[in-house]
Amino acid sequence: MLDSDARLASDLSLAVMRLSRQLRFRNPSSPVSLSQLSALTTLANEGAMTPGALAIRERVRPPSMTRVIASLADMGFVDRAPHPIDGRQVLVSVSESGAELVKAARRARQEWLAERLATLNRSERDILRSAADLMLALVDESP
């Protein structure tokens, strides 16, 4: 790895961590943890799936996802239903109250970020748009 690549990796990592921290604090009264909100958001965006599929999508171990799902179900944010093909499996989906929570959290983050982006000029915003696309591609291609 070139020194410039190592520096870029370090700078990007720091920027992503700081941005993540800022976004995390946009909804401090949320009743769910970040891992719970991430699972809810995945279900809201991608639809019902098995706990195993959700664990893979969230890149966590199945027992960890089982605990996340159980706590979300206890709070009424997800619904469980029998799998239509494999009776041994269940499908987890976001409930109506879970979908509302995802929308509220998304809205709080987007409002804060929109305020910050408004301080940038068009060229800077275009650079961030390209960077966001590249970063998403890097993450989505990662094993």
From Swiss-Prot:
Residues 51-74 bind DNA. It holds the Pfam family MarR. It comes from the Bacteria. Gene3D superfamilies: Winged helix-like DNA-binding domain superfamily/Winged helix DNA-binding domain (1.10.10.10). Disulfide bonds: none annotated. Residues 5-137 form the HTH marR-type domain. GO terms for molecular function: DNA binding; DNA-binding transcription factor activity. Disruption phenotype: Knockout mutant is hypersensitive to bedaquiline. Deletion of the gene does not affect sensitivity to capreomycin, pretomanid and rifampicin. The keyword Transcription regulation applies. One of its GO terms (biological process) is response to antibiotic. SUPFAM superfamilies: Winged helix' DNA-binding domain (SSF46785). Keywords: Antibiotic resistance, DNA-binding, Transcription, Transcription regulation. Part of a regulatory network that coordinates tolerance to the antitubercular drug bedaquiline. Homodimer. Contains a winged helix-turn-helix domain connected to an alpha-helical dimerization domain. This is HTH-type transcriptional regulator Rv0880. It comes from Mycobacterium tuberculosis (strain ATCC 25618 / H37Rv).
